[in-house]
């Protein structure tokens, strides 16, 4: 993700409720699990997607802690 894309993503996250943030986090965690499984099986082609999903989860957690 480029810097502008990251800023837009975080801006979008800040507009969501806690429930929506939790839902988005769970979806990304499921995707991360699937990506790790593919990587272990040697089927993952976009290895950078692992890092990107981890960072998105961290951004969601950051926004969640800002609200608290």
From Swiss-Prot:
| GO MF assignments | structural constituent of ribosome
Which keywords accompany this UniProt record?
Answer: Ribonucleoprotein, Ribosomal protein
| Gene3D superfamilies the record matches | 1.10.287.310
What domain of life does the UniProt record list for this protein's source?
A: Bacteria
Q: Which Gene Ontology cellular-component terms appear in the entry?
A: cytosolic large ribosomal subunit
Pfam families named among the record's database cross-references = Ribosomal_L29
GO biological process terms, semicolon-separated: translation
Q: Describe the family membership recorded for this protein in Swiss-Prot or TrEMBL.
A: Belongs to the universal ribosomal protein uL29 family.
* NCBIfam families referenced in this protein's UniProt entry, alphabetically: L29
PANTHER family per UniProt: 60S RIBOSOMAL PROTEIN L35/50S RIBOSOMAL PROTEIN L29, LARGE RIBOSOMAL SUBUNIT PROTEIN UL29C
Q: Supply the name of the protein.
A: Large ribosomal subunit protein uL29
Q: What is the lineage of its organism?
A: Bacteria, Bacillati, Bacillota, Bacilli, Lactobacillales
């Amino acid at each position: 993700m480029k810097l502008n894309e990251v800023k837009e993503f975080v801006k979008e996250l800040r507009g969501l409720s806690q429930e929506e943030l939790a839902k988005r986090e769970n979806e990304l965690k499921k995707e991360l699990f699937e990506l790790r499984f593919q990587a272990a099986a040697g089927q993952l082609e976009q290895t950078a997607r692992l890092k990107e999903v981890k960072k998105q989860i961290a951004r969601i957690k950051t926004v969640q802690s800002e609200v608290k």
